[in-house]
Amino acid sequence: ASKTPVGFIGLGNMGNPMAKNLMKHGYPLIIYDVF
């Protein structure tokens, strides 16, 4: 079974480690962040 994509709007101090952990476990990510 494929994993559900997870979306993040802004990574910041909390979202960055969460996104890295999800990527490590094979979740496809959709990320929007303004630099």
UniProtKB/Swiss-Prot annotation:
Spell out the GO cellular component terms annotated for this protein, sorted alphabetically and separated by semicolons: mitochondrion
Reaction equations catalysed? 3-hydroxy-2-methylpropanoate + NAD(+) = 2-methyl-3-oxopropanoate + NADH + H(+)
EC class, as a word, reads: oxidoreductase
- SUPFAM superfamilies, from UniProt? NAD(P)-binding Rossmann-fold domains (SSF51735)
Residue sites binding NAD(+) per the record: 4-33
What EC number(s) is this enzyme filed under? 1.1.1.31
UniProt-recorded Gene Ontology molecular function terms: 3-hydroxyisobutyrate dehydrogenase activity; NADP binding
Which residues are annotated as modified residue N6-acetyllysine in the UniProt record?
Answer: K24
Concerning Pfam families, the annotation shows: NAD_binding_2 (PF03446)
The residue stretches assigned to a coiled coil in this entry are none
Which residues are recorded with the post-translational modification N6-succinyllysine? K24
* Pathway(s) served: Amino-acid degradation; L-valine degradation
BP GO terms, sorted = valine catabolic process
Give the main location.
mitochondrion
Q: Which domain of life is it from?
A: Eukaryota
Please provide the record's keywords in A-Z order.
Answer: Acetylation, Branched-chain amino acid catabolism, Mitochondrion, NAD, Oxidoreductase
The cross-references to InterPro entries, in alphabetical order and at most eight, read: 3-OH-isobutyrate_DH-rel_CS, 6PGDH_NADP-bd, NAD(P)-bd_dom_sf
* Places the protein is found: Mitochondrion
Q: Which family does it belong to?
A: Belongs to the HIBADH-related family. 3-hydroxyisobutyrate dehydrogenase subfamily.
Assembly mode: Homodimer.
* Protein name in the entry: 3-hydroxyisobutyrate dehydrogenase
Source organism per entry reads: Oryctolagus cuniculus (Rabbit)
